[in-house]
Design a protein with these regions (language model features):
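General beta-strand recognition
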Residues: 34, 56, 76-77, 100
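C-terminal motif of bacterial Sec signal peptides marking the signal peptidase cleavage site
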Residues: 14-17
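Positively charged n-region of N-terminal signal peptides that target proteins for export
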Residues: 1-4
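Bacterial signal peptide processing site
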Residues: 19-21
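N-terminal glycine/threonine-rich, aromatic-flanked beta-hairpin/loop signature
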Residues: 43-71
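Short, conserved beta-turn/loop elements at beta-strand boundaries and strand-helix junctions
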Residues: 73-75, 96-97
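Tryptophan-anchored aromatic micro-motifs
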Residues: 25-41
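Beta-sheet ligand-binding and adhesion/scaffold domains
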Residues: 37-39, 81-120
Length: 120
C-alpha cells in the first residue's frame, strides 16, 4: 500500500512539474496591440504598433517612439527616443490573441506585469 501511494504521488508531481505555459512569442513580435494600465486608480489605454526594429505607442494624445532590440523570441529591450533608461520586457505566456508579460527598468529589480492584446 505504501509503495502504491508513493507511486501515485510521484505520478502526480511529475505531471504538474511538466506543465509549461504556452509561449508562442514569435506570433507577437510584430503587429498592432492594446494595453490597459492603471495610474492613480484610473484605467488608461495605450495602443502601439511594433515592427522588428521599432515600437510606436499612442497614449493620452501623445506619440512615443522606441527602438526594439530582441534578445530572443520572448525578450526584448525598448529604448525610447528621449533616451530614458531602457525597459526590459519578457513574454511569460501567450494565448491566441494576447500575451502576458513582465517588464522592468534595466538594472532595477522591481518588475510589473501586464497583458497586451493583438488587434490585427
Amino acid at each position: 500500500m505504501k509503495h502504491k501511494l508513493l507511486f501515485i504521488l510521484f505520478i502526480a508531481l511529475s505531471a504538474t512539474s511538466c506543465y509549461q505555459p504556452e509561449r508562442n512569442c514569435a506570433d507577437f513580435k510584430t503587429g498592432d496591440f492594446t494595453f490597459e494600465y492603471e495610474v492613480d486608480g484610473q484605467k488608461k489605454k495605450s495602443n502601439f504598433t511594433r515592427t522588428e526594429k521599432y515600437s510606436i505607442e499612442h497614449y493620452e494624445n501623445q506619440i512615443d517612439t522606441a527602438s526594439v532590440r530582441w534578445l530572443n523570441d520572448c525578450e526584448f529591450i525598448l529604448n525610447t527616443s528621449t533616451n530614458e533608461t531602457p525597459i526590459h520586457y519578457k513574454i511569460l505566456s501567450t494565448t491566441k490573441n494576447s500575451y502576458m508579460f513582465e517588464y522592468n527598468v534595466v538594472g532595477k529589480a522591481n518588475k510589473s506585469k501586464g497583458t497586451a492584446v493583438k488587434t490585427n
